[in-house]
């Protein structure tokens, strides 16, 4: 049996109490913004509270809000977004928590609540540098162990910092500074006024 968005929102507000900062209903979906210090208890309540029962963590990712809305964003830079599914109630919810420190973004791990979060949290750590406190094995998962930086951050250089190549003289893979020159891709301006109207 499916639950309406309004009744789901009321149940979640009751279950989360002061941990809830904001609820957003948009495009038929419900987003909950929770306090960073109450993130893990709120997620546990979403799983175990009888009005919620979100048994499955579908996805968890990091977000870099710098430059969001054409630079109009004034809130914290990094957030963690989780999508939860309640099979028993046929309901979905999105949970967003903002990292309080932009220099060292960190939130609690939810691996103890949903073991499936392990690799999602490792991915967010690898790509955004978000630290998940209490994670049993927080290390890179997609980039090389010697990789410098976090490639999904908006201030990461487009061409990267170093490049890998095989050196036949050393017979091994080596790292070297990026040799690609940065360039601006400016669209070509067509000055012919009849361009594109079918005339030759």
UniProtKB/Swiss-Prot annotation:
Gene Ontology cellular component list: plasma membrane
GO MF: NADH dehydrogenase (ubiquinone) activity; NADH:ubiquinone reductase (non-electrogenic) activity; quinone binding
Record EC number: 7.1.1.-
Membrane topology of the entry: Peripheral membrane protein
Location within or outside the cell: Cell inner membrane
UniProt entry tagged with the keyword Cell inner membrane: yes
Top-rank EC class of the record's enzyme: translocase
Disulfide bonds: none
Subunit comment: NDH-1 is composed of 14 different subunits. Subunits NuoB, C, D, E, F, and G constitute the peripheral sector of the complex.
Function statement: NDH-1 shuttles electrons from NADH, via FMN and iron-sulfur (Fe-S) centers, to quinones in the respiratory chain. The immediate electron acceptor for the enzyme in this species is believed to be ubiquinone. Couples the redox reaction to proton translocation (for every two electrons transferred, four hydrogen ions are translocated across the cytoplasmic membrane), and thus conserves the redox energy in a proton gradient.
Family according to the record: Belongs to the complex I 30 kDa subunit family.
NCBIfam families membership: NuoC_fam, PRK06074.1-1
Protein name according to UniProt: NADH-quinone oxidoreductase subunit C
Species: Thiobacillus denitrificans (strain ATCC 25259 / T1)
Lineage per the UniProt record: Bacteria, Pseudomonadati, Pseudomonadota, Betaproteobacteria, Nitrosomonadales
């Amino acid at each position: 049996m499916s639950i309406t968005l309004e009744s789901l929102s009321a149940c979640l507000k009751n279950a989360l109490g002061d941990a809830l900062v904001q609820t957003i209903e948009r495009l038929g979906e419900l987003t909950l913004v929770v306090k960073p210090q109450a993130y893990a208890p709120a997620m546990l309540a979403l799983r175990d509270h009888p009005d919620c029962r979100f048994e499955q963590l579908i996805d968890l990712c990091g977000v870099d809000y710098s430059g969001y809305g054409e630079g109009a964003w004034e809130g914290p830079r990094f957030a963690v977004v989780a999508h939860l599914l309640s099979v028993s109630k046929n309901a979905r919810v999105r949970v967003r928590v903002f990292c309080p420190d932009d220099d060292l973004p960190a939130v609690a791990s939810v691996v103890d609540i949903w073991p499936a979060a392990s690799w999602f949290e490792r991915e967010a750590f690898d790509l955004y540098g978000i630290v998940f406190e209490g994670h049993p094995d927080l290390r890179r998962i997609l980039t090389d162990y010697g990789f410098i930086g976090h490639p999904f951050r908006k201030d990461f250089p487009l061409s990267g910092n170093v490049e890998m190549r095989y050196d036949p003289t050393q017979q091994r893979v080596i790292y070297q500074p990026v040799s690609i020159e940065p360039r601006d891709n400016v669209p070509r301006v067509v000055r012919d006024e009849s361009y594109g109207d079918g005339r030759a």
